[in-house]
Amino acid sequence: MGSKMASATRVVQVVKPHAPLIKFPNRRDKPKLSASEALGSAALPSHSSAISQHSKGSTSPDLLMHQGPPDTAEIIKSLPQKYRRKPMSQEEMEFIQRGGPE
């Protein structure tokens, strides 16, 4: 008899609908490139030319740091400062390139 009473007072729980916390950019409206077009558009300037352009000041540092799809660059610029990547000095880059201390 106790089990009948327990089942009569059982509470029905409602599950909340899932709301995703991560927002991804909508890329469905962008046309897909063929393999040859994708390789041609993905060609980036060499590391040495990017450094020489940076030293001349002809290209903004934001453009050099974020050479991705334009929507990604806009998202990175809108991030609060505490979530952005710390700029790397020329000395740090050289240290990494040579593989550590000499």
Swiss-Prot record:
Chain's role: Molecular adapter that is necessary to form a stable 2-oxoglutarate dehydrogenase enzyme complex (OGDHC). Enables the specific recruitment of E3 subunit to E2 subunit in the 2-oxoglutarate dehydrogenase complex (OGDHC).
Localization, UniProt: Mitochondrion
Listed GO CC annotations: mitochondrion; oxoglutarate dehydrogenase complex
Similarity remark: Belongs to the alpha-ketoglutarate dehydrogenase component 4 family.
Annotated spans, Disordered: 23-70
PANTHER family in UniProt: 28S RIBOSOMAL PROTEIN S36, MITOCHONDRIAL, ALPHA-KETOGLUTARATE DEHYDROGENASE COMPONENT 4
Sequence ranges of Low complexity compositional bias: 33-46
GO molecular function: protein-macromolecule adaptor activity
Stated name of the protein: Alpha-ketoglutarate dehydrogenase component 4
In-chain residues carrying the UniProt-annotated modification N6-succinyllysine: K4
Record-listed Phosphoserine modification sites: S48, S60, S89
Pfam families: Kgd4-YMR31
Post-translational modification N-acetylglycine, affected residues: G2
Bias (Polar residues): 47-61
Self-association and partners: Component of the 2-oxoglutarate dehydrogenase complex (OGDHC), composed of OGDH (2-oxoglutarate dehydrogenase; also called E1 subunit), DLST (dihydrolipoamide succinyltransferase; also called E2 subunit) and DLD (dihydrolipoamide dehydrogenase; also called E3 subunit), and the assembly factor KGD4. Within OGDHC complex, interacts (via N-terminus) with E3 subunit and (via C-terminus) with E2 subunit.
Gene name per UniProt: Kgd4
Keyword set, alphabetical order: Acetylation, Mitochondrion, Phosphoprotein, Tricarboxylic acid cycle
GO aspect biological process, one term: tricarboxylic acid cycle
Superkingdom of origin organism: Eukaryota
